């Protein structure tokens, strides 16, 4: 499955647009992790804990989006956009959206 942020795929012709597809994931961060991450942020370093959480959320959201696209009969997702939102109580939401398409073989 081809997944791209562009609206077309070089060398490929879109046979059919199947519609909007998305994957949503909500992840929680625990209090100890938040505390340690805040110490890292205070001393000026990067928060590896949060970076890995972001990467995990992104990957899970994209995987869910791809699964839904396959179920629609797609062999590619174009125009992919990723969005991250922080929710209360240390929760984070990751959303991947795109257009499921069928490419000519």
From Swiss-Prot:
InterPro entries: UPF0145_dom_sf (IPR035439), UPF0145_YbjQ-like (IPR002765). Disulfide bonds: none annotated. Belongs to the UPF0145 family. HAMAP family: UPF0145. This is UPF0145 protein Aflv_1588. It comes from Anoxybacillus flavithermus (strain DSM 21510 / WK1).
